[in-house]
Swiss-Prot record:
SUPFAM superfamilies per the UniProt record, alphabetical: P-loop containing nucleoside triphosphate hydrolases
Membrane topology: Peripheral membrane protein
EC number: 7.5.2.10
Native source species: Escherichia coli (strain UTI89 / UPEC)
Record protein name field: Xylose import ATP-binding protein XylG
Family statement drawn from the similarity comment of this UniProt entry: Belongs to the ABC transporter superfamily. Xylose importer (TC 3.A.1.2.4) family.
Localization of this protein: Cell inner membrane
Gene: xylG
Amino acid sequence: MPYLLEMKNITKTFGSVKAIDNVSLRLNAGEIVSLCGENGSGKSTLMKVLCGIYPHGSYEGEIIFAGEEIQASHIRDTERKGIAIIHQELALVKELTVLENIFLGNEITHNGIMDYDLMTLRCQKLLAQVSLSISPDTRVGDLGLGQQQLVEIAKALNKQVRLLILDEPTASLTEQETSVLLDIIRDLQQHGIACIYISHKLNEVKAISDTICVIRDGQHIGTRDAAGMSEDDIITMMVGRELTALYPNEPHTTGDEILRIEHLTAWHPVNRHIKRVNDVSFSLKRGEILGIAGLVGAGRTETIQCLFGVWPGQWEGKIYIDGKQVDIRNCQQAIAQGIAMVPEDRKRDGIVPVMAVGKNITLAALNKFTGGISQLDDAAEQKCILESIQQLKVKTSSSDLAIGRLSGGNQQKAILARCLLLNPRILILDEPTRGIDIGAKYEIYKLINQLVQQGIAVIVISSELPEVLGLSDRVLVMHEGKLKANLINHNLTQEQVMEAALRSEHHVEKQSV
């Protein structure tokens, strides 16, 4: 049986740089192939070639789809062939309804008039196909990210898709939403729809894939059956070296208590009847890594936003640093107390995309380069920028490059560099490795271990339980705004954490295995 897709010897250059160098990829109808590689490895470039974003003639090589050569000059050419791509940044219009988004550019008309009855009927069938029980008239902006992702798939199905490309589809989804999405992909597979799945979450890659293709530095490293590969095998192929331990387990000692929070309660910014954090108390020691785990909506981010002074609603409670009660109502007061934070959404809250990498790094510490006068010491600032880039291993062609052009991992390193310029005693990391590749994750994990060895206290909030358990000395478990457990991490398991989160009792338990 002929392949559904064959990409033969694809080479794509930008100037003198080969982004893709003689890469071949093939898959059958109904096959799920995961495309793995670090950020900058060439995955996105290869997919843009396939989809016609980079038109025929701008690359070398040949693309055969359903037995015919594709010479696309535009993405609409490949869509008409049955190839659809769903990017991590969803391409939905939030102000339009679900129906309007699904049929945008593909409206059903009779004599120039849109047939809303027929489109509604078709939309209902598409939504049922992706297990979405919502009205076609629902405004997309009122949906959660998981539901929006499914609307994107329904939109692709409306175009008679035969090959679906998913780029980091679960980066912002909950565990339950991820499970629903993977089930739908498997169902589409049963209907003969092939899928190219791109993700840094290797547990998902293993769970969903028939075949795994690895690209490194623009070159095809290998394609293997997923059943015969472990996560360690994938990592080794991706980074070109064996990572003996993803989570560095370097010994460090904890010191005296540096932070204590007592009876913290935070209310919804709009509805004062809803408590997002409910009577939470905990402490933190110097040189300790404190993980905070829980399902989405548990109140983890709200808790640390109160600590950093950026929670938009009202809150009450007491914060003690070095045994003294402090009042923190904005981020400037938090920074003055030695607290720095890497936010959950780096694109929205962490970077200024059009500003240079260097300027993003020094943004919160410009007073270091003024010397008491209003004029910046440009030489001192540039020296500090270059040292930070080197220390954090930020991969950029220039410190003047707009940070929005860097990979997610390098953006995250730049934000960390900014935090370290503040000489923090307490560092808060909210989803520190979301959407970044395995190599960048490893470097950030090593940095966290180095910081706690210097006595810096670190709070890690993560939706990935293996990350929380791999890094933390102690784990707080939250559920629906309440602290359910305070667990010392002596070989804690994911099952123990989830059991603690879902237990009906509200008292705090301690584990000292």
